[in-house]
Swiss-Prot record:
It comes from Polynucleobacter necessarius subsp. necessarius (strain STIR1). It is an enzyme of class 2 (transferase). Disulfide bonds: none annotated. It catalyses: RNA(n) + a ribonucleoside 5'-triphosphate = RNA(n+1) + diphosphate. It comes from the Bacteria. Its EC number is 2.7.7.6. Zn(2+) 2 binds at C823, C897, C904, C907. DNA-dependent RNA polymerase catalyzes the transcription of DNA into RNA using the four ribonucleoside triphosphates as substrates. The lineage of its organism: Bacteria, Pseudomonadati, Pseudomonadota, Betaproteobacteria, Burkholderiales. Belongs to the RNA polymerase beta' chain family. PANTHER family: DNA-DIRECTED RNA POLYMERASE, DNA-DIRECTED RNA POLYMERASE SUBUNIT BETA. This is DNA-directed RNA polymerase subunit beta'. Binds 1 Mg(2+) ion per subunit. Binds 2 Zn(2+) ions per subunit. It holds the Pfam family RNA_pol_Rpb1_4.
Length: 1420
């Protein structure tokens, strides 16, 4: 019995630790881990199958193979625990020690660790300052290295010099034997490492760093300094990179399993260890035999190779292979990659108490319920049932309980019912792309074998019932059940965390039913009746006196919320009013929760409207009411859809009568363009662009005509007049309500299919004029197949890409958690409505909703405060702000948050998934990553929905005013008047604004270069008026001066080519690509100069630079040599490439490249300073552009000749303005315009991609990612801190260090912001565990080990890996409580120690008194 009690005492308590340190193990350390040396390569005896003594599975070293039993069987049972058998030497203990006891191999010759040799940059090379090539030659016995020059003359030989065999012999002959020491192999390298004096090296490098000026040297020194300093601080000795002892993994971690038929399955590691032991033993023998040097050398080399293979097979040379010719899996492979230790077993484990089954719809369930098959429940809840059976005394032992459950007696089912009540279970559907992919439900027991799922949660799970499967998990502990219920219950997760929209929105049939019931129709049965209340309406409807859609008047009582603080019915005040409505709406209004007005439902309920309805309900009536309301909507919807009995017939696809005419007109126009092309008025490219445009427009027209005919129908009203009303056509109703299908799809059914794209994305210029109702001919069908096939191929490829993007995003943000309420930041960003092309893309309300404002928001007229400083802006505030016409609001943002190693709640604002201010402990980083990653996958899976039908945006060619007001131009707008008196824009960044009578900006439009302005500044503008027009298909080059054109370098066949159109015979001059020219003319650039009547150059106003207009490649010259040119005349046209269809296929890589912060290929060049432009001396292929700033300093840019320069001589440019066209480089934006501009750029660009697909993501998620991309800074001047110039450090770390230095009155470090791509940012995190589990495991671990890094376990990932609660949510408070408790314990211990000390210092008599008082014996 005592032994049993001792056994219980043995259980190890939880070890509390706060950091994990990684380092290199010294030989002594390895020996201290070991339980004995492995001397033999044998594993087990072939006859007895028992482990061989001193072999790889030796029981003496690693422990017994059976619990409490020695190998020879002399000692068995618990009572001999801890005894070491004198016969076989095995300790009697648990067999599981074979999982933790290590052995070791004493190597006969030192061996270099391959990771420190070959992982780039080579750490050995760095420390020794030798090249990898040289070190390898020494290690693999091809060369000698000088360890000690000895007595050789000064300068003849230095430490670390490499010598070949011949040189060595020559030198030995020259200086005599034993004068100097040079060794081959790892011993030489080890001796070199031992002789390094690190402190002295560090001092000399620091001195060199200060002295040198070259960037390359600074970089090299800084790298080496970092490594050496790490050795200094971590106490790791460099020579430990060379191993003298090799640790042996515990045998249970490299098992040897007998298979049927007498064969064995074994881990590859055993093979690798065996080779090492064999070669090591052979080497020992050779050394004892004093074998010739060359043989020993070969054996040493083979030993080195064997150890290399064990550690990282295939890293150097050919990989070692087993009997079946496949490379063996080494220790390194065990930990890296998807199937390695980190990702396979630590970050995601298989879970017990789980099951999976097919899902079916459960329309009768409540939102928080799911149907669980009885058999499944019985299996999952077994332990609970056993427990209950025992407490009730039905079964006496667990074994009896098991029998009872297996026989499935009636009592078991009763107990199951009881156990399951209010015990939430979790359902998960793969792929789990966001946090709504796992939700908790209360199980209802059902017959059958399929799980029933509530229809409203399908949107969150992205589930449908075509065979999807879901997994069930059971939270076991009380805490787990509590968290599942409060945080994960489906009825507590009704909003999408990505955008704050409701996730429990009905779809498909339900929407159709609700829509059908809330439509109204003219002259319906019983139209014009008046009802006293809703009960009367129901009675009349059931009696068949009215139809659902009839227009009637009903007296309705609504309840308004008057007191938000009150409880129950006291919150509401009723008010009764007669409404003109339809029967269906009146009946439906019965399910509205109190506090919602009838107006909300008094309209046809389309999908968007229903979403708005649920959203309003959530904001006004709270969560509970909303969930009940959603459930009722669902029930009503299903019932109404059934009653409506909507069906589809082929006659419902009405082909518009005007289709023939539209297509004929389009064909005529196309023929017209063909003619123009024949006669040479347009180029083939222009003709193609126009043809595609014509057919695009024709398709839209047919679509519009079809929708007009489909959506309206003429009926007689009750006075006998013919009126138009919305049609009750089934297909139209489905699309209009948002239940199924879209206008684009109906267009393919009944309009025309339109333009199709080729597999490469270019548009085929002959459209499919037929639709599916008419049927396609063979050619049309063939053209369609491209799109369909491309869609499927895309889907397969994109799913993987999108998943990878999500993984990178999660990894970069995983440690970002809200850790405090308020950081006290006073800076933020000023939000305006997002306007593009004159249209408001995102209204101000959407951008500021759920953020915290900075400063009071005041009434524009009365100046009274309407929203005080530091308020979270909710719907009411935002509506008020919009109503007052305030058009910009300053709000706090994640990017300006001052919290270190986390965020504060105020800067983040509203938690979109819950609707209030974010809680401390919320893992906002992961939520952001999921919100951005999830639609990526969704969209990619949806590329093919419009089967390649070329859904391309029509090219804008003019600006129309959307509102009334006065026209203003921005300060950057420059205009010239041409000979016809038109105003031609010659600025690149000009904008037209429309302001209202109060001077508030209503809209803003970018006006491109070369556009014609139709109105003068300050002119009154009416909505719908055109402000400017331009040719969208070519870009002009416009003369700003008058004169006579004189061509320079415009030589046919040299710089320009005559393009004679084969068909028309007309010719134009086109500038040809420099690459296609002869060598002599490569650097020459065709230029048009302007000269006046006297033959002198026309000068640029205010300068002495002549006007010369450079022509870029592809420009078509429209003037002739010697022609008189007026101001504003077009000198040349540059055709714009045809558009490829855009679809998220382009989008996903675009998002990835933004987050990876890649510099685009032909990036725009931005002005680095504000100043005046001039052109310097040209080089061979480049032109030199000089910007002279106000202080007269010149900044030079070299720009390739073929690039279009947007500025000209004498122009003044502002810092950050574009000088050469191209996509912007985010790194430039950061350095020239700062963090705020960069964030705006990335947010806008990412949002553009998602918006194109109609996906809503809140800006703050993208800002969170940007914050993580900016989390490192580069030190430019270390001041008095411990950093090195050019070192990249964590921003929070630098701030902490600076605070410390400033507190001591010294100089803080100066730094530059650095933008890192998400992969780079993940790998450069301070936590090596997180980085190693992400990518490049070997490199990360090698670096961490050399540096002796410590991981403070701050992020989520590190904690998951070591098996702890994550420091977020409940885990954060748990951890804080533990910290407080530990601090308290420490303080208490100190207090007690202090008191004891004080007592010890007191006089002796008092001490005696104290003892007498307490009645205890004197401790002495």
């Amino acid at each position: 019995m005592k032994a049993l009690l001792d056994l219980f005492k043995q259980t190890q308590g939880d070890e509390q630790f706060d950091v994990i340190k990684i380092g290199l193990a010294s030989p002594e350390k390895i020996r201290s881990w070991s339980f004995g040396e492995v001397r033999k390569p044998e594993a087990i005896n072939y006859r007895t199958f028992k482990p061989e003594r001193d072999g790889l599975f030796c029981a003496k070293i690693f422990g017994p193979t059976k619990d409490y039993e020695c190998l020879c069987g002399k000692y068995k049972r618990l009572k001999f625990r801890g005894i070491i058998c004198e016969k076989c030497g095995v300790e009697v203990t648990l067999a599981k020690v074979r999982r933790e006891r290590m052995g070791h191999i004493e190597l006969a010759a030192p061996v270099a660790h391959i990771w420190f040799l070959k992982s780039l940059p080579s750490r050995l090379g760095m420390v020794l300052d030798m090249t990898l090539r040289d070190i390898e030659r020494v290690l693999y016995f091809e060369a000698y290295v000088v360890v000690d020059p000895g007595m050789t003359p000064e300068g003849a030989m230095k430490r670390g010099q490499i010598m070949s065999e011949d040189e060595y012999i020559a030198k030995t002959e020259e200086y005599g034997d034993g004068v100097f020491t040079a060794i081959m192999g790892a011993e030489g390298i080890r001796d070199l490492l031992r002789s390094i004096d690190i402190d002295r090296e560090v001092e000399t490098i620091r001195a060199d760093l200060k002295a040198t000026g070259s960037d390359a040297k600074i970089k090299k020194y800084a790298k080496r300094l970092k490594v050496l300093e790490a050795f200094q601080t971590s106490g790791i000795k460099p020579d430990w990179m060379i191993m003298e002892v090799l640790p042996v993994l515990p045998p249970e971690l490299r098992p040897l399993v007998p298979l049927d038929g007498g064969r064995f399955a074994t881990s590859d590691l055993n093979d690798l260890y065996r080779r090492v032991i064999n070669r090591n033993n052979r080497l020992k023998r050779l050394l004892e035999l004093r074998a010739p040097e060359i043989i020993v050398r070969n054996e040493k080399r083979m030993l080195q190779e064997a150890v290399d293979s064990l550690l990282d097979n295939g890293r150097r040379g050919k990989a070692m292979t087993g009997a079946n010719k496949r490379p063996l899996k080494s220790l390194a492979e065990m930990i890296k990659g998807k199937s390695g230790r980190f990702r396979q077993n630590l970050l995601g484990k298989r879970v017990d108490y789980s099951g999976r089954s097919v899902i079916v719809v459960g329309p009768t369930l409540k939102l928080h319920q799911c149907g669980l098959p009885k058999l499944m429940a019985l299996e999952l809840f077994k332990p609970f049932i056993f427990n209950k059976l025992e407490t009730l005394g039905i079964a006496t032992t667990i074994k009896a309980a098991k029998k009872e459950v297996e026989s499935q007696t009636p009592i078991v089912w009763d107990i199951l019912e009881e156990v399951i009540r209010e015990h939430p279970i979790m359902l998960n559907r793969a792929p789990t792309l966001h946090r709504l992919g796992i939700q908790a439900f209360e199980p209802m027991l059902i017959e059958g074998k399929a799980i029933q799922l509530h229809p409203l949660v399908c949107a969150a799970f992205n589930a449908d019932f075509d065979g999807d499967q879901m997994a069930v998990h059971v939270p076991l502990s009380l805490e787990a059940q509590m968290e599942a219920r409060t945080l994960m219950l489906a009825s507590n997760n009704v909003l999408f965390p990505a955008n704050g929209e409701p996730s429990i929105v009905p779809s498909q049939d339900v929407v159709l039913g609700l829509y059908y019931a809330t439509r109204d129709k003219i002259n319906g049965k019983g139209e014009g009746m008046v009802f006293a209340n809703i009960t009367e309406v129901v009675r009349a409807y059931e009696a068949g006196q009215v139809e659902l859609a009839s227009r009637v008047a009903v007296r309705i009582t609504e309840y308004e919320i008057v007191d938000k603080k009150a409880e129950g019915d006291a919150r509401f005040a009723g008010k009764t009013k007669i409404y003109q409505t339809s029967v269906g709406r009146a009946i439906l209004s019965e399910i509205l929760p109190k506090g919602m007005s009838f107006e909300e439902i008094n309209k046809p309920l389309k999908k968007k409207e229903i979403s708005r309805l649920i959203n309003t309900s959530f904001r006004k009536c709270g969560l509970r009411e909303t969930v009940i309301f959603a459930d009722r909507l669902l029930q009503s919807g299903f019932r109404l859809a059934t009653n409506a009995g909507i069906s589809v017939a082929i006659d419902d696809m009405l082909i518009p009568t005007s289709k023939e005419r539209i297509i004929t007109e389009a064909s005529t126009k196309v023929k017209e363009y063909d003619k123009q092309f024949m006669s040479g008025l347009v180029t083939n490219q222009e003709r193609y662009n126009n043809v595609v445009d014509i057919w695009g427009a024709a398709g839209d027209q047919v679509g519009k005509a079809m929708m007009d005919e489909l959506s309206h129908v003429d009926v007689l009203d009750r006075n006998g007049k013919t009126v138009r009303q919305e049609s009750f056509n089934s297909i139209y109703m489905m699309a209009d309500s948002g239940a199924r299908g879209s206008a684009a799809q109906i267009r393919q059914l009944a309009g025309m299919r339109g333009l199709m794209a080729k597999p490469d994305g270019s548009i085929i210029e002959t459209p499919i004029t037929a639709n599916f109702r008419e049927g396609l001919n063979v050619l049309q069908y063939f053209i369609s197949t491209h799109g369909a096939r491309k869609g499927l191929a895309d889907t397969a490829l994109k799913t993987a890409n999108s998943g990878y993007l999500t993984r990178r995003l999660c990894d970069v943000t995983q440690d970002l958690v809200v850790i405090e309420e308020d950081c006290g930041a006073t800076t933020g960003v000023t939000m305006k409505a997002l306007v593009e092309g004159g249209e408001i893309i995102e209204a101000l309300r959407d951008r500021i909703l759920g953020r915290v404002c900075i400063g009071d928001i005041v009434h524009p007229d009365t100046q009274e405060v309407i929203v005080p400083n530091d308020t979270l802006l909710d719907e009411d505030h935002v509506d008020q702000i919009v109503a007052l016409g305030i058009d910009e609001v300053k709000v706090r943002t994640v990017l300006s948050c001052l919290t270190r190693f986390g965020l504060c709640a105020k800067c983040y604002g509203r938690d979109l998934g819950r609707g209030g201010l974010v809680n401390v402990g919320e893992a906002v980083g992961v939520i952001a990553a999921q919100s951005i990653g999830e639609p990526g996958t969704q969209l990619t899976m949806r590329t093919f929905h419009i089967g390649g039908a070329a859904s391309r945006a029509l090219v804008a060619s003019n600006i129309e005013a959307k509102s009334n007001g006065a026209l203003k131009f921005s300060g950057t707008m420059r205009v010239v008047k041409n000979s016809r008196g038109e105003q031609i824009v010659i600025s690149r960044s000009g904008e037209a604004l429309i302001v209202d009578e109060n001077g508030r900006e209503r809209e803003r439009h970018k006006v491109p270069y070369g556009a014609t302005l139709l109105l003068k500044e300050d002119a009154a503008v009416k909505a719908g008026a055109s402000l400017a027009t331009w040719d969208p298909l070519t870009r002009p080059i416009i003369s700003e001066y008058a004169g006579i054109a004189r061509f320079d370098n415009v030589e046919e066949g040299v710089t320009v080519a005559k393009q004679v159109d084969e068909i028309t015979g007309l010719s134009t001059l086109v500038v040809i690509d420099g690459k296609r020219r002869s060598a002599a003319s490569k650097g020459v650039r065709p230029v048009i100069n302007l000269i006046d009547d006297k033959g002198n150059d026309v000068m640029i106003a205010g300068t002495d630079h002549p006007v010369n207009i450079g022509l870029q490649v592809g420009a078509l010259i429209t003037v002739k040599d010697g022609q008189k040119v007026e101001v504003g005349e077009v000198l040349a046209r540059i055709p714009i490439e045809s558009q490829k269809t855009r679809d998220i296929t382009g989008g996903l890589p675009r998002v990835a490249e933004l987050f990876e912060a890649r510099s685009p290929k032909d990036a725009a060049v931005l002005a680095k300073v504000t100043g005046t432009v001039s052109f310097g001396k040209e080089t061979k292929g480049k032109q030199r552009l000089v910007i002279t700033d106000m202080d007269g300093e010149a900044n030079e840019f070299l720009i390739p000749k073929e690039k279009q320069v947007l500025v000209h001589d004498g122009q003044v440019v502002n810092k950050g303005e574009m000088i050469v066209e191209g996509p912007a480089d985010p790194h430039d934006i950061l350095t020239l315009k700062g963090i705020e501009e960069l964030a705006i750029y990335i947010v806008d660009e990412v949002q553009d991609v998602y918006r194109l697909q109609g996906v809503k993501i809140n800006d703050k998620h993208i800002e969170v990612i940007v914050r993580q991309m900016l989390r490192r800074v580069q030190v430019t001047d270390p001041g008095d801190t411990s950093f090195i110039t050019g070192e990249q450090v964590e921003r929070s770390k630098l701030y902490d260090e600076n605070d410390r230095v400033i507190a001591e009155g010294k100089h803080p470090a100066q730094f530059d912001n650095v933008l890192l791509g998400i992969t780079k940012a993940s790998l450069s995190t301070d936590s090596f565990i997180s980085a190693a589990s992400f990518q490049e495991t070997t490199r990360v671990l090698t670096e961490a080990a050399i540096m002796g890094k410590t991981d403070t376990l701050r992020g989520l990932k590190e904690n998951v890996i070591i098996g702890r609660l994550i420091p977020a949510g409940t885990g954060l408070s748990y951890r804080r409580a533990r910290k407080v408790r530990e601090q308290f314990e420490r303080d208490r211990a100190q207090m007690i120690a202090a008191e004891e000390e004080a007592m010890a210092n007191m006089p002796v008599e008092i001490e005696a008194e104290v003892v007498a008082l307490t009645g205890e014996a004197d401790p002495s």
